[in-house]
From Swiss-Prot:
PANTHER family: DD-GDCA PROTEIN, DICKKOPF N-TERMINAL CYSTEINE-RICH DOMAIN-CONTAINING PROTEIN. The chain crosses the membrane at residues 340-360. This is Uncharacterized protein DDB_G0272420. One of its GO terms (biological process) is negative regulation of canonical Wnt signaling pathway. It is found in: Membrane. Residues 317-336 are annotated as: Disordered. Glycans are attached at residues 126, 241. The keyword Transmembrane applies. InterPro entries: Diff-Dev_Assoc_Protein (IPR052326), DUF7107 (IPR055531), Znf_CCCH (IPR000571). GO terms for molecular function: co-receptor binding; receptor antagonist activity; zinc ion binding. It comes from Dictyostelium discoideum. A zinc finger (C3H1-type) spans 114-140. It is a single-pass type I membrane protein. Its main location: membrane.
Length: 360
């Protein structure tokens, strides 16, 4: 009898310990909400300050403007696609190949390029990587020259396609264009991720992910998506590439491309392409959780007027009337609450049994 009693106590203890780490107390893990420092407040590093301000001499300060004295690239706005550089103790614009330069233009052509006829061009005219080429251009391997991307040409990498396309089987295919239940070849960018679809890694077809927007604890709770901290201090399921459900994302990326062409911008920056850069930044903010849930950048994105109803980003019902993810979320929440109540009652009962066994 004594052995049976000990076994019952041990089993009950193990069960209670497992319950204490489960969903009964709300499995959605709490995330820390950070308090950012404003200009003039004491700091230890730039991550303590509101973006894009920096920490210098233990004080939050604005980034240094072009032409002002500096000590590091960070002071000049390193975050702007590395275009702000501290050159010989003065902040300057590090121009890319294809950018306007010379008289009437700020900045210095970057390493490996020179200013000719008011344009930054490669020293010997040859490129060695795609990153040296202007927007919508790639480094052609046979000629080592920057060539414009042409839709319809064969490709062997994504950079040979427009930014709105990816290279799939030597052909440029429009991103996010595959419908539900159609093949995606294991490439997540082919499925309509902004509409709630994901590329099933096993079957390699586009499938609806009804976990979008639901609370989570680990990535495994999100199907093919990932679990991230949101702005409310909780974890939430988003797409595998941190994508959010939002019906304006495709329009945003197309607007950005049109702007880059209309303004003849060669690189994406707030200094050399000031009209298009906010469109790009707002696209990233509205469509990707990695930016939308970045607490440090919250004030920065508000200054760009990127704010959107958060509900439309995390609630599929708001983004797509035909998507039933929202109702599934409510159903799952009710089921979760019911399970939690049951487990709490069970744990209390087991606790009472343990007390009685110990006493008697």
């Amino acid at each position: 009898m004594k052995n049976i009693k000990i076994i019952i106590i041990l089993i009950s203890l193990i069960f209670l310990i497992s319950i204490s780490n489960s969903e009964i107390f709300g499995r959605s893990e709490q995330c820390p909400l950070i308090s950012l420092l404003k200009i003039g407040e004491d700091c230890q590093s730039s991550s303590d300050c509101e973006y894009p301000n920096i920490c210098k001499n233990n004080k939050c300060q604005e980034i240094v403007q072009v032409g002002d004295p500096c000590e590091s690239d960070e002071e000049c706005g390193l975050f702007f696609n590395n275009i702000g550089k501290c050159i010989s103790g003065t902040c300057d614009i590090n121009l890319k190949n294809g950018d306007d330069c010379g008289e009437g233009h700020s900045g210095t052509c970057g390493e490996g390029s020179v200013c000719k006829f008011y344009k930054c061009v490669l020293n010997n005219g040859n490129c060695t990587s795609d990153s040296q080429c202007p927007f919508n251009h790639y480094c052609e391997e046979n000629s080592n020259t920057c060539s414009p991307v042409v839709l319809g040409n064969q490709c062997d990498r994504d950079s040979m396609c427009p930014i709105t396309h990816i290279c799939q089987k030597n052909e440029c295919v429009a991103k996010y264009s595959r419908e539900t239940a159609t093949p995606c070849g294991g490439n997540p960018e082919l499925c309509d991720v902004f509409n709630g679809d994901e590329c099933d890694k096993v079957h390699k077809i586009c499938r609806r992910n009804d976990k979008y927007g639901s609370e989570c604890y680990v990535d495994g709770d999100c199907g093919t998506g990932v679990c991230m901290c949101n702005n409310d201090g909780h974890k939430q399921c988003v797409g595998s590439n941190t994508t959010l459900v939002h019906d304006g994302c495709l329009q945003a990326i197309n607007s950005f491309v049109k702007c880059m062409k209309d303004k003849r911008c060669s690189s994406v920056s707030p200094l050399t392409c000031k009209d298009c850069y906010p469109i790009w930044e707002c696209y990233r903010y509205n469509c990707f959780a990695s930016e939308h849930f970045d607490q440090r950048k919250s004030a920065y994105y508000k200054s760009l007027k990127c704010d959107t109803d958060v509900g439309s980003l995390v609630n599929p019902d708001a983004a797509n009337p035909n998507y039933n993810g929202g109702s599934n979320r409510k159903t799952n929440q009710k089921r979760s609450n019911s399970n939690s109540n049951y487990l709490i009652s069970l744990s209390l009962t087991l606790t009472l049994i343990l007390i009685l066994l110990i006493l008697f």
